[in-house]
Structures are given as structure tokens and as C-alpha cells.
Amino acid sequence: MLFYSDNNKDSYDSNHAIIFKDRIKDIQKTLEDITEFYRNKGIKPTIFQSITDNEYFESCKEIFAAHGYDVFEEENRYMVLLDDCRIVPNPLVEVRKAERWEDTFRTDIFEAAGEPWETEVAKAALEKDHTLFFVGYIEGRPVGMTYAHTKDGVCRVDYLLVATEHRKKGVGRAIIQTFAKYCMENEIENCFLWPDGESAERIYDEAGFRLVEVKKAARACYLK
């Protein structure tokens, strides 16, 4: 499975392949095809392991290396919204549910957080009907956001980002508190995520998310 965006070549979210072990016959030919596809587009190839294929990339590490890839493994800690939120939000942070894109989201959140490549991904997500998008404001200025995808009775939280200068002010907690409250009030069930680090996991735990499973995630990055 190949994802790509000619307009956002620096984003891993927009440009990556996923390999499913049971759908390929020749891993070497598959790697050659993936590498050629992305290099012809001027994109550095990144390949993700299917979450169902535990340890598959590790078992093929020498094959990946022979084709110019390095394999990295990390834990994905899956959390599900099961309990009531315990967060008391900072009253100076106002959180709103966004219905349309604003250019200040790009400058004041993504660029201010040092992640401009995620702008087009978030913008495209907001344009879809099944996306929940919440923005945190301080003194009327957007300083953080999160968004989630809802489909077929499942809600996956994709991203939580706060502008660098506004971190450690309770912005992330306020945003997640509003999001969790919205899900509970609107009976949005099966809401899950995997946190990016211990700090994020603590915030999600306070919001009522509980750790339910830990899986090994793997990706292969092209080094040439």
C-alpha cells in the first residue's frame, strides 16, 4: 500500500508505504518497487510494518539493509477512552471545535511548533466530514490542536500539537479535556490512540484513557 503527496513531500504521514506480510511473495522485489516508486517522485522512501505482522521487519533486517534501509522498532502503547476525565483545565485556555481551516493554524501552531510539514495533512483531515478537530486559544490566538478520525463506530486520535512557546501551560490538557468531554457527551465509543511519549501518556490517562495493549511497531527508513 503506497501513500504519497506531490505537494507535501517532507511529511511521513503523506508519503509512506505499508507492507503486509501475507500479501507479498518476494520481499526483495517489493522493496525494489517501493524504492523506485518514491525515488522517481523525489521522495525519500519510508516503509511501515503492518501492526498485525509483529517482528516481521526485524526478521528481514539484513534484506532491508541490502536495499539501503535501516529498520527501527518501538512500542505502540494503545489506550482507549474508558473512564471519566479528571483534568481541571487552565481557565486561560479556550478550546473550540474547528469547522474550517484558518491560516493562523499554520503559522501559530504548526510552524510555531517546528512541524510545518504536518500542515497539509491536518488541513486535508479537517476538510473531511468524519474528522473531529479541536483548537486551543490563549488571548484569541491559536496555540495548539488535536484531531481525530471517526468512522464505522471507531474514533482514532491522530495528533496533539502545541506551539513550542506555549508548552507547559496546560494547553494540551485543556484540549484533550474538551475532546474527551465531547466524546462522552456525544456517545462516541471505541475512541483510541497511542501516545507519543510519557508526558502525553500522562495527559491521556488524566483524560480517562487506559492502556489496553502494547505492540511492537517497526519502520524502515531509506538511508542512501
Give each language-model segment a name.
Residues M1-K41, Y56, K61, P116-W117:
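N-terminal charged segments
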Residues N8, E115-T164:
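A conserved beta-strand-loop-helix scaffold within acyl/acetyltransferase catalytic domains
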Residues I19-D22, F72-Y78, L82-E120, A124, ...:
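Short amphipathic alpha-helix that is part of the acyltransferase structural core
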Residues I27-T35, Y159-V162, K168-K181, E185, ...:
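Conserved acetyl-CoA-binding loop-helix of GNAT-fold acetyltransferases
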Residues I27-V93, E99, A217-C221:
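Acyl-donor-binding surface of acyltransferase catalytic domains
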Residues K41-I51, C183-D196:
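Conserved GNAT acetyl-CoA-binding A-motif
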Residues N54-V71, R173, G197-V214:
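Conserved active-site alpha-helix within GNAT-family acetyltransferase domains
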Residues E73, P142-G144, E213:
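A structural microfeature
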